[in-house]
Amino acid sequence: STLMRSSAASDVYKRQVLPNAIIINYGDNDTFPLWFNQEVDGVRPDVRIMNTSYLGAEWYIDEMKTKANDAPGVPFTLPRSKYTYTNDIIPIFNVVDRPLELKEAIDFIRSEDPRTKYDLGDGHLVDYLPNNRFALPVNKDNAIASGIVKESDRDLMVDTIYLELPKRTIDKSEMMLLDMLAHFDWKRPIHFTQV
């Protein structure tokens, strides 16, 4: 049956991910088998399952911040005022000529300073990102302690991962993913699924 195949597929996903991981997937066909497997069969209660299709909804962001089963919440740091009835689309203007550290980019969005806002021309100020290039420092000790990287591979690790978004806007779910990456500090493995 379809349910058996879906449950078996989700069981494979969840048995192959590292302890205390976050599994990020993109739609109901990926998510519901994982939820079923976890909630009904009790498989991997330490893993947090996150569906990016729902990350545009404030109720889901709030839910992801809280503990579920044995899994801690997702390390989102932006306050509700930055994702409730706002920031559905965030423009990117390349006005800074260097990659921004991801925490710096999220702090820019978090700021209420008018200098960190874009004026739409009618006096309405909106959040924006001042660059589409980002730097994500690698906490090597945490990456090893969490099992993301083996100790034997420490010398192969880079100090910083550079990201470039090939577009002029991000949506709310992408903003939240950047917030998570900026603040997870390599303490939890992050896995992505794709069908």
Locate predicted features.
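ER/secretory pathway lumenal C-terminal domains and tails of membrane proteins involved
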Residues: 1, 7-20, 37-195
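Phosphate- and divalent-cation-binding pockets in alpha/beta enzyme and binding domains
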Residues: 32-36
